[in-house]
């Protein structure tokens, strides 16, 4: 018999009754029923109930054990009485009568319990993450993650992709976030960077003549934390393909992601229709470039109904160039109480409020419009709005106005809140959409032209498009949205040096700077580069969706906290003076 176990804690069943066995694991919990001890022994695979009475040679020793001690049990498999069978356990038909016990690893008093799902402060959970990971829910999440990665690999290999590894220490590259810099000991004053993504390397793989590449790639970005984003590092399914257009990438990716969600989606419906939605339409209809299509609400522009109307705030606002009034339909939301609640929500988001109209049955039995806006713009305009939005009695509509960029994000959040409050957002399904035609450029906080997304994407229209207004240039850039999250981002790459130089020039990077920062890739493009494109899927976020978790840290084995600190390992930490001298660095005190 093996030194530690003959079986795992999920293998024993009625067929093993009468056998002598050996099990090892953690003490999940102990119950003393008047001279009979019941002990749940847990390992990676499951739980087995162990019993000992006063006649057992192991009884005295078992009385001393506490939760989370690691022990080895010798004993005999017994059938449970029919009334005591536990159908929730794989081993619920049997129990092991203990004849011997050894302590393999004692445990101090626990800072947080493993048994049960008691909610503990995140700081405590992350400081003792190794204990936190023993809890059933987190253990399941990590196994889900492992199985998702395995499935992704199998699906990519099955689709004819080849897995290659790229460097994880390289040169700094402006890709939209701050780099983590690594000082060079051999080259004082110079720094490497941890890659924000394998972007340049995967493109070089295409230039090198390989056709379909993928890897499960670690990425490093010094970002502000969010519930759906790690502040330091994450993993992505990185993909690149040669001789492809946008639709070719979509056709390769959809079977992989759709199949993955069907495999691990716990029976939730996975929509097979993945619409293409232009970025501008997504912002107009949903107030987001990662719309949740489970919510049927679609916003519309209703400016014509307020221009020159009696509602002076909107009428005057529309006299300014680039402004509009947008409506958020709210089917079944036609009560003043609900409208006031949503108005308060808008105020909590930093807006002065939202105007609203709701339709109800009047005293004469006919439908009438109510609310402050209805009184100001009159029945003809309110009826025109109702017809445009397709609303009826018992429905409502909310209104925001201004330049779209000033209110779209809040309008999107209001749409989400309205759909949730009214029960309009469909549960138990995954709905996907490709967001396409992203703007290539945007203005930064200082009013300068900058890349809005990936700087390596091909502009639609090529060089000719770059000769016009940069803010009107669309890129072959696309995202995949699912249930309100961005799962994938990608693009068709700019593989022609002259177009690349022009694209970067418009964003303020002279040719010399591009040569310096991306010299390897520019050089490669001069030696025969194929048209190519690809994308990257966020694995952490995919697992978060599949696990139905609201916080990405629940699906990462050892995550940082919201201040980008590793409380278990004590990172970041102060370097020693010797380390600083070796790197020829010194720490400058804060002012």
From Swiss-Prot:
GO CC entries: cytoplasm
Q: Where is this region: Aspartate?
A: 199-202
SUPFAM superfamilies in the cross-refs: Class II aaRS and biotin synthetases, GAD domain-like, Nucleic acid-binding proteins
Q: By its UniProt entry, which Pfam families does this protein fall under?
A: GAD, tRNA-synt_2, tRNA_anti-codon
- Provide the residue positions that the database annotates as binding ATP: 221-223, 486, 538-541
Name the enzyme's class: ligase
Any one biological process term the GO annotation gives: aspartyl-tRNA aminoacylation
> Which keywords does this chain's UniProt record carry?
Aminoacyl-tRNA synthetase, ATP-binding, Cytoplasm, Ligase, Nucleotide-binding, Protein biosynthesis
Tell me the PROSITE patterns matching this sequence: AA_TRNA_LIGASE_II (PS50862)
Q: Where in the cell is it found?
A: Cytoplasm
Q: EC number(s)? A: 6.1.1.23
* Gene Ontology molecular-function annotations: aspartate-tRNA ligase activity; aspartate-tRNA(Asn) ligase activity; ATP binding; nucleic acid binding
Positions of the record's site feature: Important for tRNA non-discrimination: 33
List, alphabetically, the CDD domains matched.
EcAspRS_like_N
Q: Which reaction does it catalyse?
A: tRNA(Asx) + L-aspartate + ATP = L-aspartyl-tRNA(Asx) + AMP + diphosphate
InterPro entries assigned: Aa-tRNA-synt_II, aa-tRNA-synth_II, aa-tRNA-synth_II/BPL/LPL, Asp-tRNA-ligase_1, Asp-tRNA-ligase_1_N, Asp/Asn-tRNA-synth_IIb, GAD-like_sf, GAD_dom
Q: Where does L-aspartate bind?
A: 175, 221, 453, 493
Record note on quaternary structure: Homodimer.
Q: What does this protein do?
A: Aspartyl-tRNA synthetase with relaxed tRNA specificity since it is able to aspartylate not only its cognate tRNA(Asp) but also tRNA(Asn). Reaction proceeds in two steps: L-aspartate is first activated by ATP to form Asp-AMP and then transferred to the acceptor end of tRNA(Asp/Asn).
Which family is this sequence assigned to?
Belongs to the class-II aminoacyl-tRNA synthetase family. Type 1 subfamily.
Which protein, by its recorded name, is this? Aspartate--tRNA(Asp/Asn) ligase
Q: List the lineage, top down.
A: Bacteria, Pseudomonadati, Pseudomonadota, Alphaproteobacteria, Rhodobacterales
